[in-house]
From Swiss-Prot:
Basic and acidic residues bias spans: 75-84
Top-level taxon: Viruses
Residue ranges of the region described as Disordered: 24-85
Protein name as catalogued: 12.0 kDa protein
Length: 110
């Protein structure tokens, strides 16, 4: 009789262990994952929404302004003055020759 009781108890333990393996613990309260949240919305009301736009920064300017130093050096100022005296307005384009690997500058006169 004791053997039958131990067998029944062992069988109940095995059934309980099989149920536990089939339904693992998720680590959350039951029903917490049933409610779906809209995209861009947090669960808790204290936080800022996810889709809030970041602080907008003013544009930095054109590429030419980024490459140009804030205060021109004396050497650059002399070069610009010499170019104006010769009637050179601006740098139009670069053309590269592959054979000699040197660049030719084409200037446009005023």
């Amino acid at each position: 009789m004791l053997a039958n009781t131990l067998k029944a108890l062992l069988l109940l333990c095995l059934i309980q262990a099989a149920r536990t393996v089939a339904d693992p613990v998720k680590g959350r309260a039951p029903g917490s994952s049933e409610q779906l949240h809209r995209s861009g919305e947090r669960k808790h009301g204290r936080s800022a929404p996810l889709n809030a736009s970041p602080l907008k920064q003013p544009p930095l300017g054109s590429v030419g302004q980024l490459l140009r130093p804030a205060l021109p050096s004396t050497r650059r100022q002399e070069r610009d003055d010499k170019g104006r005296a010769l009637g050179v307005n601006r740098l139009e384009s670069y053309s590269f020759r592959r054979k000699s690997k040197c660049s030719l500058l084409h200037f446009v006169a005023q």
